Amino acid sequence: MSYELVVGLEVHCQLNTNSKAFCGCSTEFGKPANTNVCPVCLALPGALPVLNQRVVDDAIKLGMSTGCSIAPHSVLARKNYFYPDLPKGYQISQFEEPICLEGCLSIDAGEGQRDIRLIRIHIEEDAGKSIHDIGDDTFIDANRSGVPLLEIVSYPDIRSSKEASAYLQKLRQIVKYLGISDGNMEEGSLRCDANVSMRPRGESEYGTRTEIKNMNSFKSVEKAIEYEAQRHIDVLEAGGTIVQETRLWDADKLETRSMRGKEFSHDYRYFPDPDLVPIAVDDAMLDRLRKELPEFPEARAARFVEEYDIPPYDAGVLTAEREIADYFEETVRVSGDGKAASNWVMGEVLRTLKEKYIPIASFTISPERLGELIGLIAKGTISNTIAKQVFEKMQELDEGPQEIVRKEGLAQVSDTGAIEGVVQEIIDANPAQVEQYRSGKTRIFGFFVGQCMKEMKGKANPAVVNDILKQKLDEGMTGDA
C-alpha cells in the first residue's frame, strides 16, 4: 500500500525583547541562574503580571507578514499543568481567542510554490529550566520563566520532510526580517514540534498522529520526520495501530522514542487569566505597525533586478537575509555600481563569511569601504586582481582601500611608455609565440597578456596592455603581408 505523509508544525519563536512578557526583568541570555527574576517570575503571592506592549506589537507584525486576520479583541489564558520549572503551576498563553488567525506561508521545496496555511499565531510565556547535571539533584533556573514567545501553528498541509524544512526556513527568514527574533534553532530561539501521521494515498481522513519534540536544526527536523514516517508505515503494515503520543528525537541514535501520552486541550483546563485585561487592537495601532513593516525578500529581490540590473538568482541570494541585503544596498550607494557590488558581495564577501563561519554583522569590511574599493577599480586606480589583494588586507588592517593602495604601492600603472617597454621586451623574448600569433593562432594572445601582467606584478592596466600588445602584434602581421 502507498502512504501519504501528513505533517503540521507548531513553532515557538522567542522574541528578542529587552524585558520579559509580563514583568520588567531582563531577557539577557547566559546570566547566572535565578538572577533575571522577580516576584512575578517566581509566582510569589500578590505579584501581578503586566503585559509587555512590545510583545503585542511583534505578534501583530508577524500576523500581518503572514496574511493573518488580526483580532480586535483577544484574551490571555491560563494553561494549567504541573512541572517543576513552572513556578505558577500554569503558563500564560492564549486559547479560544488568539491575536492572529488564518494566515499562510508560501514555500518552495524544489517542486514549485506551495501555500501552507496557518491556523493561528498566539502569545505565550516560556517556562523555567530544570538542570539535571549537578550531582544527583535537580535544580531550577527561573531566568527563562516569562520570556516572551509566539507560537505559530500550521494546518497539516505539509507533505514531505523537505517541505517542513522549507516552511521553517521561510518562517525564520520572516522573523529575522521583522527584527523580532534571531531565529536561531540551535540556541532555542526557534523551537519546532512536528505532528506526523500517515494515511493511504488518496484518502481524505487523517491517520493517528504523533508529536515529535527535541529537534534543534532544519536537518534534524527532516531526519526526525522521515524516521517517524517510516516507523508509522512499519507499524501499520505489520497490522499494528499508532498510539497518539509525544516522542523525543534522539539526534545521536537518529530515532524517536516515547516520552509521554499526547495531551489534549481539555487536559490543560484553559480559562481567561483574571489578572490580565483582554488585548484591544484598533485601526490606529494597525496603521502604525503596518508602516513599520520592512520590504520583504520577494519584493526586495524584484526591485533589485529592476533597479540594479542583476539576475533574479543573484537578487534572491542577496535578499535571503536582511543584513546581507542592507550591506549590498549600502555598497551600491557608495560605489554607484549595482552589478559590481553584486559580484563582490556574492563572491568575496559571502565566501569569506562561509570560510570564517561568521555573520555579516561580524565582517570587518564595512559596506562603505567595499564601495570605495569598487570605486577604485572603476576609476582605473587598481585592477580587479590587485583589488582582491587589497580586499584581503582590508580584513587584516583597520584601514580603507585608498590608504592600503598608497602604502603598498599598488596603484595601477596606466603609463603607456612604461607598459610599451615591457610589451616590447615580452615580444622580443618570445619569437616562437609571436610567429604563432602572426600565422593566425590568435588564441595565444592571452599568453602575452599574462606575461606582461606577471612582469609588472599585476599593476599594469589590463586595457592598456591589451591595446598596446594588439597594436604591436598586428603591426607585425601587416608588415609580413
From Swiss-Prot:
<dbReference type="Pfam" id="PF02934">
    <property type="entry name" value="GatB_N"/>
</dbReference>
<dbReference type="InterPro" id="IPR023168">
    <property type="entry name" value="GatB_Yqey_C_2"/>
</dbReference>
<keyword id="KW-0436">Ligase</keyword>
<dbReference type="InterPro" id="IPR006075">
    <property type="entry name" value="Asn/Gln-tRNA_Trfase_suB/E_cat"/>
</dbReference>
<dbReference type="GO" id="GO:0050566">
    <property type="term" value="F:asparaginyl-tRNA synthase (glutamine-hydrolyzing) activity"/>
</dbReference>
<dbReference type="InterPro" id="IPR003789">
    <property type="entry name" value="Asn/Gln_tRNA_amidoTrase-B-like"/>
</dbReference>
<dbReference type="GO" id="GO:0006412">
    <property type="term" value="P:translation"/>
</dbReference>
<dbReference type="InterPro" id="IPR014746">
    <property type="entry name" value="Gln_synth/guanido_kin_cat_dom"/>
</dbReference>
<dbReference type="GO" id="GO:0005524">
    <property type="term" value="F:ATP binding"/>
</dbReference>
<comment type="similarity">
    <text>Belongs to the GatB/GatE family. GatB subfamily.</text>
</comment>
<keyword id="KW-0648">Protein biosynthesis</keyword>
<comment type="function">
    <text>Allows the formation of correctly charged Asn-tRNA(Asn) or Gln-tRNA(Gln) through the transamidation of misacylated Asp-tRNA(Asn) or Glu-tRNA(Gln) in organisms which lack either or both of asparaginyl-tRNA or glutaminyl-tRNA synthetases. The reaction takes place in the presence of glutamine and ATP through an activated phospho-Asp-tRNA(Asn) or phospho-Glu-tRNA(Gln).</text>
</comment>
<dbReference type="InterPro" id="IPR018027">
    <property type="entry name" value="Asn/Gln_amidotransferase"/>
</dbReference>
<dbReference type="Pfam" id="PF02637">
    <property type="entry name" value="GatB_Yqey"/>
</dbReference>
<dbReference type="InterPro" id="IPR004413">
    <property type="entry name" value="GatB"/>
</dbReference>
<keyword id="KW-0067">ATP-binding</keyword>
<keyword id="KW-0547">Nucleotide-binding</keyword>
<dbReference type="GO" id="GO:0070681">
    <property type="term" value="P:glutaminyl-tRNAGln biosynthesis via transamidation"/>
</dbReference>
<dbReference type="InterPro" id="IPR042114">
    <property type="entry name" value="GatB_C_1"/>
</dbReference>
<comment type="subunit">
    <text>Heterotrimer of A, B and C subunits.</text>
</comment>
<dbReference type="GO" id="GO:0050567">
    <property type="term" value="F:glutaminyl-tRNA synthase (glutamine-hydrolyzing) activity"/>
</dbReference>
<protein>
    <recommendedName>
        <fullName>Aspartyl/glutamyl-tRNA(Asn/Gln) amidotransferase subunit B</fullName>
        <ecNumber>6.3.5.-</ecNumber>
    </recommendedName>
</protein>
<dbReference type="InterPro" id="IPR017959">
    <property type="entry name" value="Asn/Gln-tRNA_amidoTrfase_suB/E"/>
</dbReference>
